[in-house]
């Protein structure tokens, strides 16, 4: 009696569920259409995951991250499969569609990542004013050297992103984007077409301007206190030149900065976490023509 390998035994267990018979009975073209729908779904969702700091490769390891992308893509695969044009798939067209889906995912991930970049810049501003930039550490969220307050803020926002429900807002924006920008739009000259709005460059610059403006507004109270402390230490240096104000300023500014953060941190979190689906899809809708 021939021996049965572990792989054959595994396939026999699957045969009992009927999964293998389902795949065998499926037409060849139909099977490829399901595979192409999965690829297109993973292109948009994987592109968004690649940009959002809380979901990058450095935060979620490779296998777990790819499994998460595939799992979240499964919800969009039937919707994409339903909208496919009839007939045998055109693989050149699907290649262009995959690139288009990745671009849309990158743009959605970019606007979802704005709060993370804002708080990191706020931390850098505060640490620059209190003279603590020498204590920079590596941030797995951005892959760069950031200040201690900056990485504290980014990790705090990352925690709230998962615990506070912002991940649901992010996923809701991703799934809602399929109704705004379908995978199979109207074709121009037989090729898939992704139309940017006429003022797309202005919209991108406006988003960068808003990011810098929010950074300055959020960090302004702490920086003003630091400035007043610097003025006060300057007056002390005028009246008592024998004191080494430079070394005295570092602990004084650090203590004032930490005290201000304790008072001001709830307002910072409320300002940043007031995020709705429209906050992500609104700028994208201005950037792309649906």
Task: Label every PLM stretch briefly.
Residues 1-13:
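Extreme N-terminal basic, low-complexity initiation segments
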Residues 10-290:
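Hydrophobic alpha-helical segments and their helix-loop boundaries in membrane
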């Amino acid at each position: 009696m021939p021996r049965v390998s572990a792989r054959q035994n595994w396939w026999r267990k699957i045969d009992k569920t009927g999964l293998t018979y389902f795949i065998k009975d499926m037409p060849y073209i139909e099977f490829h259409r399901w595979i192409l729908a999965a690829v297109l779904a993973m292109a948009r969702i994987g592109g968004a995951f690649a940009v959002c700091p809380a979901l990058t490769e450095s935060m979620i390891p490779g296998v777990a991250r790819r499994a998460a992308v595939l799992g979240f893509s499964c919800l969009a695969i039937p919707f994409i499969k339903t909208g496919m044009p009839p007939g045998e798939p055109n693989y050149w067209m699907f290649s262009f569609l995959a690139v288009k889906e990745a671009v849309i995912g990158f743009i959605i991930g970019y606007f979802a990542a704005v709060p993370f970049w804002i708080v990191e810049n706020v931390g850098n501003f505060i640490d620059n004013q209190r003279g603590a930039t020498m204590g920079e550490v590596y941030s797995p969220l951005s892959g760069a050297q950031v200040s201690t307050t900056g990485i504290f803020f980014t990790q705090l926002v990352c925690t709230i992103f998962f615990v506070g429900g912002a991940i649901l807002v992010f996923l809701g924006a991703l799934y809602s984007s399929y109704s705004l920008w379908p995978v199979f739009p109207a074709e121009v000259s037989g090729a898939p077409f992704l139309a940017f709005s006429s003022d797309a460059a202005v919209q991108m610059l406006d988003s960068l301007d808003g990011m810098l403006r929010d950074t300055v507004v959020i960090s302004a109270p702490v920086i003003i206190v630091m400035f007043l402390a610097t003025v006060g230490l300057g007056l002390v240096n005028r009246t008592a030149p024998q004191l080494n104000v430079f070394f005295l300023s570092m602990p004084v500014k650090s203590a004032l900065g930490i005290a201000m953060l304790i008072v001001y941190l709830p307002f910072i979190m409320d300002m940043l976490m007031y995020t709705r689906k429209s906050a992500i899809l609104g700028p994208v809708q201005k950037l792309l023509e649906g």
